[in-house]
């Protein structure tokens, strides 16, 4: 039996059109994390710098989910490497 997939906007609809396909449980988990982000991720007309920060944060969330599902520490390291860029993008605005 195939799992049903849903499209997930990695940075929220207001910040990017980039999407990935996720199974429903993974989409729900990622969305729960996304809802804890800086409230500006829900705003329209964010600056490009802020949008890029949320894109990086979305990629980080995907990498962390992959780490949890596979126990492959490489994904954790990749996610961790994005923290500086995310912080710089979100704090500078």
Residue positions per predicted region:
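Charged, amphipathic alpha-helical linkers/stalks
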Residues: 34-69
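Short flanking/linker segments adjacent to small metal-binding domains or redox-active Cys/His motifs
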Residues: 59-93
């Amino acid at each position: 039996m195939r799992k049903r997939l849903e499209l997930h906007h990695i940075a929220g609809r207001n910040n990017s059109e980039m999407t990935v396909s996720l199974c429903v449980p993974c989409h729900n988990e990622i969305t729960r994390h996304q809802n804890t982000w800086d409230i500006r991720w829900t705003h329209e007309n964010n600056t490009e710098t802020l949008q890029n920060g949320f894109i990086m944060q979305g990629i980080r969330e995907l990498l962390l989910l992959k780490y949890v599902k596979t126990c492959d520490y490489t994904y954790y390291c990749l996610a961790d490497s994005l923290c500086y860029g995310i912080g710089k993008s979100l704090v500078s605005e």
